[in-house]
Amino acid sequence: TDSRKHFLPLRGTANGSLTRAAAERLGASSLILETTTREQPLSLRVRQHRVMVRTLLQEIGILGDGAPTLTSPKDRLDLRVAIYDGGGAGTSGPRNLEQVMKTIPRSLNWRIGPADILEGALDHFDVVIFPGGSGSKQAAALGIQGRDKVREFIERGGGFVGICAGAYLAAANYSWSLKICNYNTFCETREIPGVGRKSMWYRGPSSTVTMQLTTEGHEILGRGVEPFHIRYHNGPIMSPAGIPELHDYQVLGWFRSEVFHYETQRGTMVNTPAIVSGKFGKGRVLSISPHPESSQKLRYLVARAIRWVGGL
């Protein structure tokens, strides 16, 4: 080790053009990373920096060729949670989940994307959360290999929380879904007079519905003033899939009111599961159709859900 060589932290914004000119003039070996746009997921922007630093350290001989892009923290924490923010994830969900994580002592949360999952990033976590957005787009972003990685993570004992789109992702009835919980979603197409054939998953814009927990729901998620008034935005309407290879799910909460966009949807949501839990391999799965993470008063439900799938 050469004691004369060390890293210097910079203060303020670097002048990229001046840095390039200086490196060229001095003949210095340099790496310049242009910050990606804010429209890109945070996990992707952070990943770019990690990859750059790894490349730099490999270039100067500090790291070997097989060095990972992500490592576990030195301090052992009670709960390490990965929050998916890649393709198909909405913008507010990950932010709200980060607020939820602040209420869980001795925990760490980190945003991850499809590339991280493909590289084995889930090995560093106890729980993965897939937030609202689009379940099919999340599945497409993951690809077959990425979805297999998520399934393997849960099968080995990892925890999975799916909210709205994430609950669609966990379902058993799509070609692209993970099939980690034994429920179907109400997504068939029906003929609407004067409109044509429409899929039944769409029930209109964001709205408020009521939800009531079961005895099992109280044990896992805690108690509050019920029925809960909770935000709903086209989350899955769940019913048993009856797949022999999967464990039956347990209902933790029921919808006690409904919203519908088409008359044929009337009566198909009220008294159906709002929250279910199940097992997949050695792991735990918890799917939430509405959005408790959107309400500061209801975030404790999500915190309890995360702790439960994480084995705490």
Regions of interest found by a model, annotated:
Residues 1-84, 91-92, 96-98, 111-112:
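Structured catalytic-domain cores with a bias toward divalent-metal coordination
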Residues 28, 155-159, 283:
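A short helix->loop->beta-strand "cap" motif at the edges of active sites that frequently abuts
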Residues 36-40, 87-90, 134-136, 166-170, ...:
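Solvent-exposed loop/turn segments at secondary-structure junctions
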Residues 49-77, 151, 177-179, 268-273, ...:
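Extracellular ligand-binding/catalytic regions of CAZymes and related secreted enzymes
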Residues 84-88, 114-115, 130-134, 255, ...:
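Structural motif
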Residues 90-175:
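Helical hinge/lid and interdomain linker segments adjacent to catalytic or ligand-binding clefts
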Residues 136, 140-225:
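A glycine-rich, often tryptophan-bearing local segment used as a flexible ligand/cofactor-contacting loop or short
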Residues 204-284, 289-293:
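Catalytic beta-strand/loop cores that center a nucleophilic Ser/Cys/Thr
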